[in-house]
């Protein structure tokens, strides 16, 4: 069956009522792709650059060793390139499935239509739909079936041709520079996001990729990695990408919590921190991480812990320096399901922590941060230059991570321990670049495609001690960290 035959079939059956229309639609398209299976390698070798770039982008979004389902897997090459611990490919074409099984015998391939997918009892960490939505008879129905194989942390990754290039694609097919494929759905990003919502998913981030879909060495790499993300030029990318997650449901049980409290020269705040700390979840663990203080903070932490044997309090001393090192030490020894940071200066009140807990348990966020820039703060809580710097870095990081944030440097941050384990395992992607820990967590959460939300808090003037920051030196360091992250996150794929 030729592409024109398949298109005529599809247009006719789409106007009929299912299930008869769907049966005919699938039969026609399977016949077409069974025939195309014998030609696919030839046409891909004519322009390998596009498919190599798609595989590179998919590897950016999907870590090695994950459980991956690809719907519309074709010959299985993209799925194999992701190096999954468990890889399952689904395709409408029996001929494509046969070729995929022959090429990649270590992976599992099944002959099935996306609209009739049934993998009862299976769950996957990532579900890939690469260049598939253009062929689906019922996009919403296919997406709804994916809910059955998704757990709360599953990420759906969808890419498809941008509608901007529809006339060019047809021209290339007419000139026989591209094999004519029966693409019928030229959807926008808004269309796909709406269909995802209807199917029970919400978008975490969306982005365009690939300005130059050719293998032209450094020219293509420069165009696709840098130029494709610049204003105006990003309107002309070839592919749209959406990362989505299941719309969250409230946790069935109360998760336990570990609160890590880095403290350096904060002796006068330790007793208050313990006294004002609310009980959270099924169990609350408090870990003080002392940072070589000069005011007996360590002795105060130990004394307060001994005075409250009814509470689960641990005291640790960091071997390194900086808040980031203290947080990493505390998180490494935490036993709670949920990990929180509470700065020992108490400029964010311990009484605010239940708001963060509720946002996590409800599923509203997977990485929750405080924002000091919503409510009016105490007059002396933040100096003017610090306020300007915070607003600037909020805008900058919103662009870099693709999710809106206002306050990057509020010390109160919350993440699931399981997600933090993945973040720590992938820390080499950015390197050990952040002595404060804020950017390390933000960029790591963005790389994992976690839903980032902010909780407005009232920022109070500290009542003891002095700030442990230097405005100009620290601002310059934050700029350098932002530049590094831009290269490894915003311009990385």
What is the meaning of each model-derived region?
Residues 2, 8-10, 224-257, 268, ...:
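Hydrophobic helical membrane-anchoring modules
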Residues 74-116:
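Class I SAM-dependent methyltransferase SAM/SAH-binding core
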Residues 110, 298-333:
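Conserved donor nucleotide-binding strand/loop of the catalytic core
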Residues 290-299:
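A conserved acidic beta->alpha catalytic loop
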Residues 5-63, 217, 226-227:
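Conserved class I S-adenosyl-L-methionine
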Residues 339:
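Short aromatic/hydrophobic "clamp" motif used to bind/position activated sugar donors
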Residues 165-185, 318-333, 350-431, 435, ...:
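Acceptor/aglycone-binding surface of glycosyltransferases and processive sugar-polymer synthases
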Residues 140-152:
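A short glycine-rich, Lys/Arg-flanked "PGG" loop and its adjoining helix->strand segment in the class I
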């Amino acid at each position: 069956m030729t592409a024109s035959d398949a298109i005529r079939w599809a247009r006719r059956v789409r106007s009929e009522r299912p299930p008869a229309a769907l049966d005919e639609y699938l039969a026609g398209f399977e016949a077409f792709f069974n025939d195309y299976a014998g030609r696919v390698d030839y046409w891909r070798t004519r322009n390998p650059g596009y498919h190599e770039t798609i595989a590179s982008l998919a590897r950016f979004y999907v870590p090695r060793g994950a459980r991956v389902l690809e719907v519309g897997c074709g010959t299985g090459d993209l799925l194999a390139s992701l190096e999954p611990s468990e890889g399952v490919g689904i395709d409408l074409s029996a001929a494509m499935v046969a070729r995929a099984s022959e090429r990649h015998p270590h992976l599992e391939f099944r002959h099935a239509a996306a609209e009739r997918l049934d993998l009862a009892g299976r769950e996957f960490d990532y579900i890939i739909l690469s260049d598939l939505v253009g062929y689906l008879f019922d996009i919403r129905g296919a997406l709804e079936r994916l809910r059955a194989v998704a757990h709360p942390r599953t990420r759906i990754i969808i890419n498809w041709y941008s509608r901007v290039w529809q006339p060019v694609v047809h021209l290339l097919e007419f000139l026989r520079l591209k094999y004519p494929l029966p693409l019928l759905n030229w959807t926008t990003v808004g269309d796909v996001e709406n269909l995802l919502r209807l199917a029970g998913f919400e978008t975490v981030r969306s982005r365009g990729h690939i300005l130059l879909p050719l293998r032209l060495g450094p020219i293509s790499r420069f165009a696709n990695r840098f130029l494709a993300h610049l204003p105006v030029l990003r309107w002309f990318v070839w592919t749209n990408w959406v990362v989505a997650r299941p719309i969250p449901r409230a946790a069935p049980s109360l998760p336990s919590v570990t609160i890590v409290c880095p403290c350096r020269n904060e002796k006068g705040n330790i007793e208050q921190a313990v006294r004002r700390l609310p009980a959270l979840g099924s169990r609350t663990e408090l870990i003080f991480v002392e940072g070589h203080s000069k005011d007996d903070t360590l002795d105060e932490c130990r004394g307060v812990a001994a005075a409250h044997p009814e509470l689960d309090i641990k005291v640790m001393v960091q071997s390194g320096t900086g808040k980031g090192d203290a947080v990493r030490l505390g998180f490494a020894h935490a036993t709670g399901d949920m990990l929180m940071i509470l700065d020992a200066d108490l400029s964010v009140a311990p009484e605010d922590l239940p708001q963060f807990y509720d946002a996590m348990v409800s599923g509203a966020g997977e990485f929750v941060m405080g924002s000091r820039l919503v409510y009016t703060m105490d007059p002396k809580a933040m100096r003017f230059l610090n306020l300007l710097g915070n607003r600037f870095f909020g805008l900058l990081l919103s662009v870099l991570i693709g999710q809106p944030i206002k306050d990057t440097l509020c010390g109160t941050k919350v993440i699931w321990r399981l997600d933090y384990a993945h973040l720590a395992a992938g820390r080499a992607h950015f390197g050990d670049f952040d002595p404060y820990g804020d950017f390390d967590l933000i960029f790591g959460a963005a790389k994992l495609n976690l839903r980032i939300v902010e909780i407005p808090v009232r920022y109070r003037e500290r009542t003891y001690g002095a700030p442990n920051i230097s405005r100009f030196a620290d601002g310059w360091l934050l700029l350098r960290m932002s530049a590094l992250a831009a290269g490894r996150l915003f311009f990385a794929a």
